[in-house]
């Protein structure tokens, strides 16, 4: 497992690949510090905290795993469903979540039903599609002021259909839904979510009785990527409400548990129960990078908004952060004592992320006042240069004026100092 070596960051005046990797590694380490980590104090956190601090409770805390966690594309809100049937929505106001608004919906799909998946409508700040392994897709409207959810409408697909996955395309034109092994469905969002197309799973996969394990849209919403239990990857073209199979690849030797797009459209990434992650070139569909040193099944993965960090969760309760460009390991974290199913999700507009806490709680990881890696490096460099000049000038009272002038000059020189080599 290749790791990032030490680089003297502060003596570098351009961002080379080595400097970028070192900055990223340092940034990730800082996100685990106490000052840059905050608990998301939802209903689950309150329950766990009250049980943990009670002297009169000896029974174990009942698990309540996260089933699906999604950010709105704007980064202004996120939603997640749990095994108890609840849906929690946060309208995010700050890094620590202290001022954020929580909307809690118990039994969001009705009693005895679980919200197996959810997806934000990217063209609306408060509309979510939810599925529950049933014949219905619920379109919910979340009200931030009244802290309630109302059902806009229900999409029905026939009594024997069991839809367990749904996904809006990035432009908000289409809603995709899928059962495990029967069909995928396409809805036209602009035409009141009318059903326009369906396709049998047997017509997509190479294997008989195959099962859908993962879905993803391309960044432009023109193609659909489907990962199967067999390890096959199918790519479909979506145009004018018609789905057409373009490519089938035997991508993995086990089920493909996750598919993610590089935000720049260069690559897509697949993770599998076979313990491997592959980075594929979007144009050639050739595998460009293999991460095969995880030693455990990949349960989920995500990519940061800059396309620099690949986060991977594995079945043995580990979280890994890799450099997506080089495949080198940047940082890792064991969740072995957390008693939780690992969860990792990057914000869509910054280098912060949400990760599993103990007993199925969630924690927010960030660096204060730093929304991405570039500003993190620039501010670190600036502060160090100012401190060096202050020390060189003696730092005494007799030199206050000269220090002030030097500081001003740093501000003027700054643009030329950060001309990066690409």
Curated annotation (Swiss-Prot):
PROSITE patterns: WD_REPEATS_2 (PS50082), WD_REPEATS_REGION (PS50294). It comes from Saccharomyces cerevisiae (strain ATCC 204508 / S288c) (Baker's yeast). It comes from the Eukaryota. One of its GO terms (cellular component) is THO complex part of transcription export complex. SUPFAM superfamilies: WD40 repeat-like. WD repeats lie at residues 61-100, 158-197, 207-246, 251-290, 293-332. The keyword Transcription applies. This is Protein TEX1. Component of the transcription/export (TREX) complex and the THO complex. GO terms for molecular function: mRNA binding. Transmembrane segments: none annotated. Keywords: Nucleus, Repeat, Transcription, Transcription regulation, WD repeat. InterPro entries: Tex1/THOC3 (IPR040132), WD40/YVTN_repeat-like_dom_sf (IPR015943), WD40_repeat_dom_sf (IPR036322), WD40_rpt (IPR001680). Pfam families: WD40 (PF00400). One of its GO terms (biological process) is mRNA export from nucleus. Residues 405-416 have a biased composition (Basic and acidic residues). Belongs to the THOC3 family. Its main location: nucleus. Residues 388-422 are annotated as: Disordered. The keyword Ribonucleoprotein does not apply. It is found in: Nucleus. Component of the TREX complex, which operates in coupling transcription elongation to mRNA export. The gene is TEX1.
């Amino acid at each position: 497992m290749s790791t990032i070596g030490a680089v003297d960051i502060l003596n570098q005046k351009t961002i080379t690949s080595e400097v970028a990797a070192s900055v990223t590694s340092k940034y990730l380490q800082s996100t685990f510090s106490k000052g840059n980590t905050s608990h998301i104090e939802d209903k689950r956190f309150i329950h766990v905290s009250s049980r943990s601090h009670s002297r009169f409770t000896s029974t174990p805390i009942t698990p309540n795993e996260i089933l699906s966690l999604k950010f709105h594309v704007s980064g202004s809100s996120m939603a997640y469903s749990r095994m108890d049937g609840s849906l929690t929505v946060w309208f995010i106001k700050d890094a620590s979540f202290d001022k954020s608004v929580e909307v809690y919906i118990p039994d969001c799909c009705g009693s005895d039903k679980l919200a197996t998946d959810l997806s934000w409508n990217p063209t609306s700040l408060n509309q979510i599609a939810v599925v529950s392994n049933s014949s219905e897709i619920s379109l919910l409207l979340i009200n931030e002021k009244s802290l309630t959810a109302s059902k806009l409408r229900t999409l029905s697909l026939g009594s024997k259909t069991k839809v367990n996955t749904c996904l809006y395309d990035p432009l908000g034109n289409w809603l995709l839904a899928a059962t495990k092994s029967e069909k995928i469905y396409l809805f036209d969002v602009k035409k009141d979510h009318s059903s326009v197309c369906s396709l049998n799973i047997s017509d997509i996969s190479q294997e008989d009785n195959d099962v859908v394990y993962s879905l993803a849209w391309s960044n432009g919403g023109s193609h659909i990527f489907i990962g199967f239990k067999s390890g096959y990857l199918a790519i479909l073209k979506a145009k004018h409400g018609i789905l057409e199979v373009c490519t089938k690849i035997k991508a993995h030797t086990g089920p493909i548990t996750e598919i993610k797009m590089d935000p720049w459209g260069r690559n897509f990434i697949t993770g599998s129960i076979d313990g491997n992650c592959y980075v594929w070139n979007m144009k050639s569909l050739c595998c460009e990078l293999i991460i095969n040193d995880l030693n455990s099944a990949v349960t989920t993965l995500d990519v940061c908004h800059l396309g620099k960090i690949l986060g991977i969760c594995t079945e043995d309760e580990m979280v890994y952060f890799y450099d997506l460009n080089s495949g080198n390991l940047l940082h890792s974290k064991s969740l072995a004592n957390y008693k939780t199913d690992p969860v990792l999700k990057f914000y869509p507009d910054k280098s912060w992320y949400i990760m599993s806490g103990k007993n199925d709680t969630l924690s927010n990881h960030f660096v204060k006042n730093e929304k991405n890696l570039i500003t993190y490096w620039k501010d670190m460099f600036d502060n160090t240069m100012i401190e060096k000049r202050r020390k060189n000038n003696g730092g005494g009272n007799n030199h206050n004026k000269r220090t002030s002038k030097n500081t001003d000059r740093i501000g003027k020189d700054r643009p030329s100092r950060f001309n990066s080599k690409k």
